[in-house]
Amino acid sequence: MKNKELKILLSAPRGFCAGVERAIEIVEKSIQKYGTPVYVRHEIVHNKYVVDDLKNKGAIFVEELEEIEDKTRPVIFSAHGVPKKIPEDAKNYNMTYVDATCPLVSKVHREAENLNKAGYHLILIGHQNHPEVIGTMGQLPKGSIDLIQNEDEAKNYKIQNNKKISYVTQTTLSVDDTKDIIQILKDRFPNIKEPLKEDICYATTNRQMAVKNIAKKCDLFFVIGSRNSSNSVRLVEVAKKSGCSNSILIHSQSEIPVSYTHLRAHETLDN
């Protein structure tokens, strides 16, 4: 491979979505407004470099409000959203809080609440323990929403007390995998109520489509992102399914396998 000309294809669109950019800006403006430190509950977005940069600017990241020693300081909720209980707890602590939840995630929250009020039992299609899933499930009373993660769970799902059902989804899922799960639910429960609009974020969809378009042309595919980022992990899966089995998630240049570090680009193209 030493003498082979190397062509680099850049996926387009790429980079942060509007919700991530908005959340980062909220933290930076809060630091300017309130001074330091500013607390952030959970990583504001799942990106190591962003988190480290904000730490250097004066943000302190915690997982729970109880960890905040000085509760006179403001706290920011991450882009993934939080259970309804968290803002209530912040009020009980007399804390100033700023909600950086992505507007598209907030839309799913409102949708779930409205369906619950209309008498529907909710199914949430998503990944267990992901902050967004925890936040969405935390909008509703316990027992009124169930999580389905894969096709097998969809095939085995049972309706309790013959309730009418509806579904919402995590915003950062694989478009194709989610479509298959939804189809199983629709086949099994013809009267299941669908969301008015698809819940998967348009930026997630666009980036997955972009990866599909170029992965089949590639011998090697790098997704640059963090391992706890649902979007980044899904893009690797999409690249592999689209024809590039040699697809790797890295968060920095240092993670490029040694066997590839001698390669030099002959041409770089936006695709």
Language-model-detected regions and their locations in the chain:
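Conserved small/polar residues in nucleotide/adenosyl-binding loops
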Residues: 261-270
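Active-site donor-nucleotide binding/catalytic segment of nucleotide-sugar enzymes
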Residues: 163-175
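Active-site loop-to-helix "anion-binding N-cap" substructures in soluble metabolic enzymes
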Residues: 3, 7-141, 146-158, 175, ...
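Active-site rim loops that border cofactor/substrate pockets in soluble metabolic enzymes
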Residues: 188-218, 226, 233-242, 246-250
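Conserved acidic residues
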Residues: 73-74, 165, 219
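Short glycine-centered, acidic/aromatic-flanked micro-motifs in structured strand/loop junctions
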Residues: 12, 42, 169-171, 225-226, ...
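Short acidic active-site motifs
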Residues: 153, 206-210, 255-257
